[in-house]
Amino acid sequence: EISLGLVGSEMCIRDSHYSDVWADPGSQHKPAAWEGLSLDELKAAMTAHTKDVLSALKDKGITPEWVQVGNETGPGMLWDTDAAVSGGMGGNGVEYVENKKNFSDFITTGCVAVKEVFPNAKVIVHLQGGDDNNLYRWIFDVLKENNAQYDVIGMSLYPGTDTWKTMTSSCIANMKDMVSRYNKEVMICEVGMSWDEAATSKEFLTELIAQSKAIDECLGVFYWEPQSYGGWNGYTLGAFDESGKPTVAMDAFNQ
């Protein structure tokens, strides 16, 4: 039995996408209501939204241990065709221009807003491709150069059944590099494998969790989205079967 109330009230991650749609490397579009805002107005909107959502959680007695500012923000966030207000970070096509300073400032804006509501919450900057050290050095060098405020470097990792060993090795090496290079804690914020490859998924997760535990600065490994069952709604990387029961993959978290 899974107690969602317990999960929600004790240790949880709150992830703000700052978009009308699911934000990921292919889509970091700002909310329609924020179109046309100046840079200062965008930051004010980010602050207000972040504080509103977190205050609502606080009112319900929910205290997130961690809060993400953005979701898989390797290509930046709050894209715009106008460089003056864009938070793009390249790699997202010529339509959405790069502005390293804005991206860094958006991260800081979100972080400051989080701390105003939950001073003890740790703020995560979360990127895709946890095995891609070049991406992580690129983004976090930029954040360092611009004095961005955050606490934790978060990663996603979604290997296939034939790539998990090499990707796990690369991800672990990347985490160690992030700790050494930036003196930050790290976390696997998202991990997953096809629900119908449960035995291989368990083997992968067991190895990833064991190696992550050996890194003192690694805060944990989170599966996304385990309760998506049997390819529900086209999503195949959950960890529940077609009957709605957990697969053996979840046993890896018992270690």
Where are the predicted features?
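Active-site groove signature of glycoside hydrolases
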Residues: 17-25, 50-96, 124-126, 219, ...
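Short, small-residue-biased leader/transition segments that mark boundaries at the very start
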Residues: 1-7, 11-13
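Solvent-exposed loop/turn segments at secondary-structure junctions
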Residues: 18-21, 71-76, 128-133, 157-163, ...
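The substrate-binding groove and active-site-proximal loops of carbohydrate-active enzymes
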Residues: 32-46, 96-101, 158-165, 192-199
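Aromatic-rich peripheral "rim/lid" segments of glycoside hydrolase catalytic domains that contact
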Residues: 23, 84-95, 170, 177-183, ...
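Surface-exposed amphipathic alpha-helices with a cationic face
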Residues: 8-10, 58, 107-119, 175-180
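Glycoside hydrolase catalytic-domain groove-lining segments
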Residues: 116-123, 130-201, 210-213, 217-218
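Conserved, mostly hydrophobic/aromatic
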Residues: 15, 67, 153, 190, ...
